[in-house]
Amino acid sequence: MGKGGALSESVIKNIVLSYSYVAIWIFLSFTVIVYNKYILDKKMYNWPFPISLTMIHMSFCSTLAFLIIKVFKFVEPVKMTRETYLRSVVPIGALYALSLWLSNSAYIYLSVSFIQMLKALMPVAVYSIGVLFKKEGFKSDTMMNMLSISFGVAIAAYGEARFDVWGVILQLGAVAFEATRLVLIQILLGDKGIKLNPITSLYYVAPCCLAFLFIPWIYVEFPVLRDTSSFHLDYAIFGANSFCAFALNLAVFLLVGKTSALTMNVAGVVKDWLLIAFSWSVIKDTVTPINLFGYGIAFLGVAYYNHAKLQALKAKEEEKKKIQQADEESGRLLEEREGDVEGKKNDQSGN
């Protein structure tokens, strides 16, 4: 084959790899959500201890992240001072602990399908908190889009057959804490030039998260676990669950590294629809037409938001290219001018 054929094979290989990473991420994300629901739901495995489950995940992920970074050295650690850790990582760890605790707690009260619908509010929360912290500029058209997403989720909530107020409060709290965490990552780490991939994030954040979770665990879940047989774990069930949670973080690392964060957002939309279909067909959760109509409105709003972000990124890249081209042109003209001046000096000295 010629060069064209070789190039074609290379392009096809990259496309196949990208789709493979997307498929792996969707599968693992799907598996972790359904697995957590299975463990926590009182009608299934009936182990309703969300803090304990999250602590098991964090312990497992902390250990594996330590082995990958410090022992096997597959991933380079980030330079982290004590001051940066205390001022930046600790607040992020606290928010992450709260987000995971509340989101896992919601599985006890709400269906998988309805939780995915409520998660559509994430862009609304991130944008609103970004504006509050002055990381995002207020734009009326963007705010209208955020309101349309909220309106769609409100309709979906109105049509929910198993509506539970406490479950909704828990999930909305999880969304709020996660959105705040994402904005703080940008403020506390991004502005300092510190970039954490999912593996280094687990290495630095998971132990901190574990420490924060230990405080409510002692008062809320430990007394119940101590007084019941629930304290004896099924290592096969919880080991596989923890491994899936870690593998999901590894998949995020591969997906974002080989494609982009936007690809993950789009893949996330596909995963949400698959989870809703699975929740309805296999778990037998009730999904009403009003649910789907409301989520459809929210879905269109999220899709438009992602499209607008993509267009903004493209415009930013084009602007960078124009500035770079202008700088190169200015440099070339300056060199030519200096060359002309040097030539005239040589002519004058020759005369």
From Swiss-Prot:
Location in or out of the cell: Membrane
Protein family (similarity comment): Belongs to the TPT transporter family. TPT (TC 2.A.7.9) subfamily.
Location, primary (coarse class): membrane
Region (Disordered): 321-351
Keyword match Transmembrane helix: yes
GO CC terms, sorted: endosome; Golgi apparatus; Golgi trans cisterna; membrane; trans-Golgi network
Organism ancestry: Eukaryota, Viridiplantae, Streptophyta, Embryophyta, Tracheophyta
Keywords tagged on the record: Membrane, Sugar transport, Transmembrane, Transmembrane helix, Transport
Domain named EamA: residues: 38-156
Protein origin, superkingdom: Eukaryota
InterPro entries xrefs: Sugar_P_trans_dom, TPT_transporter
Chain segments annotated as transmembrane: 15-35, 49-69, 89-109, 113-133, 141-161, 165-185, 205-225, 236-256, 263-283, 286-306
Membrane topology, as annotated: Multi-pass membrane protein
A Pfam family hit: TPT
The protein's name: Probable sugar phosphate/phosphate translocator At5g11230
